[in-house]
A protein has these predicted regions:
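Cleavable N-terminal export/targeting peptides
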Residues: 1-32, 188-190, 195
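Outer membrane beta-barrel
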Residues: 31-46, 59-179, 212-214, 218-225, ...
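Solvent-exposed loop segments that connect transmembrane elements
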Residues: 48-59, 170-208, 238-254, 282-307, ...
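Residues that define the transmembrane beta-barrel architecture of outer-membrane proteins
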Residues: 61-71, 99-103, 146-151, 210-216, ...
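Detector for outer-membrane/organellar transmembrane beta-barrel domains
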Residues: 222-347
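Outer-membrane beta-barrel "beta-signal"
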Residues: 354-356, 380-394
Length: 394
């Protein structure tokens, strides 16, 4: 573990040196280069109640001190109407063993009436709360819609409308346990390439993913007086064919869609943020490691096939002065399918953000996560956590 941590730190330091070197060479390159970053450590006391198959409660509690995965360094580069952004994070909080994470890498062209973005960035429907538990999780997996970052082509117009074409998702029939599934007879030379959906090797039995279009998001962002708001729709479609002994044994067509809306109301010194969504097969659309198991398409003959999700969250903020801000919020999401129990979950938090200096913040927080019941009707864990985020940024 120590060796891996050192590698993370060395990568972040290396990225900082690269940014600094580019900054020193700005005159020769005729570029505007702005490095930035944030280093975050969290200390938490976490207590959980979980259940055995008989439904009896069990308990555990622990203290942790660790680097947050969303610690990052990056730089912005601009030349005329073109700009770019590159950002590296310490690690993916849901996949630490993968090491240093590319958080963002994209270029933008400002063509006057709007901007064209090409690269790797968060999904347009991401809208976060101020919750810091789970590496600034912001209700991740609890009605927040955060699903990571994807290769995309995004057109944003000055009138507020945007269209994003993104890498499509291809979750297997086992749901959350089969994310990013390739066609199994793609061949060793292609299994880890962007073309791993295409069959290239004969097998008597295989699973074939047929993809036809990018994940597509159409939305709008606007402002009216004290209200900043947005919303839109997203969709994804693919097929899964299963073959055994040269005979097709299954064919599933998976349609996923999402409708979302959010708003922020500035009532200084108060502010209100709200977000809501409804979806079909949301897990297949987003492929989120934090998604509820009940949000995925299922071909189980004992139940329906499509999962239906609705959820949302609300947050109240108060600015006491230029050093102290306070936030509290609650989230709820329900995932339903005919013939089974609803897979619901909720979360709540309250925190205080204190700016010790311009570049140093501490954020104490209390958080509560309740997984309620699974799609199988069994009781799931409840988590109580209190802790502090220690953040230095530049």
């Amino acid at each position: 573990m120590k060796r891996g941590g050192a590698q993370h730190e060395e990568s972040i330091i290396g990225a900082s040196l690269v940014a600094a070197t580019l900054g020193l060479s700005v005159p020769a390159m005729a570029l505007e280069v702005t490095p930035y970053g944030a280093i975050r450590v969290a200390t938490w006391w976490t207590s959980s109640t979980y259940y055995n198959p008989a439904g009896d409660p069990l308990h555990d509690a622990d203290f942790t001190l660790d680097l947050q995965g969303d610690s990052y360094v990056g730089m912005r580069v601009k030349e005329g109407d073109f700009s770019a952004l590159a950002e590296l994070g310490a690690y993916n909080p849901k996949n630490r063993s993968a090491g240093v994470e590319l958080r963002m890498l994209f270029g933008e062209w400002n063509f006057g009436n709007g901007k064209l973005r090409v690269g790797y960035a968060p999904s347009p429907y991401v809208y976060r709360s101020e919750m810091i538990y789970d590496a600034d999780g912001g209700f991740n997996g609890y009605a927040s819609l955060f699903d990571g970052r994807y290769a995309q082509i995004k057109l944003s117009m000055n009138n507020g409308f945007y269209l994003a074409l993104m890498r499509q998702e291809n979750v297997g029939l086992a749901g959350i346990g089969a994310t990013n599934s390739p066609t199994t007879n793609a061949g060793n030379g292609y299994i880890n390439t962007p073309f791993n959906m295409t069959s290239t090797t004969y097998m008597a039995g295989y699973t074939d993913f047929d993809t036809f279009m990018p994940k597509t998001v159409l939305g709008y962002e606007g402002k009216a007086g004290i209200v900043t708001y947005g919303g839109g729709v997203a969709g994804n479609y693919y097929k899964i064919r299963t073959v055994a002994g040269n005979v097709q044994t299954g064919k599933d067509e998976i349609y996923s869609y999402l409708g979302f809306a959010h708003a922020k109301i500035d009532l200084a010194p108060f502010e209100i943020k709200v977000a809501g969504h409804t979806a079909q097969n949301l897990g297949n659309l987003m492929n989120n490691a934090a998604a509820a198991a009940g949000s995925f398409y299922s071909n189980n003959p004992a139940t329906g096939k499509n999962a239906y999700t609705y959820g949302g969250w609300g947050q109240l903020g108060y600015t006491l002065n230029n050093k102290v801000k306070m936030f509290t919020g609650v989230a709820y999401e329900s995932n339903e399918m005919r013939g089974r129990t609803s897979d619901d979950r909720m979360a709540a938090f309250a925190n205080l953000q204190y700016a010790v200096t311009k570049n140093f913040n501490i954020v104490p927080e209390f958080a509560f996560l309740n997984e309620m019941r699974s799609a199988a009707g069994t009781k799931q864990e409840r988590i109580y956590a209190t802790g502090i985020k220690w953040e230095m940024k530049f």
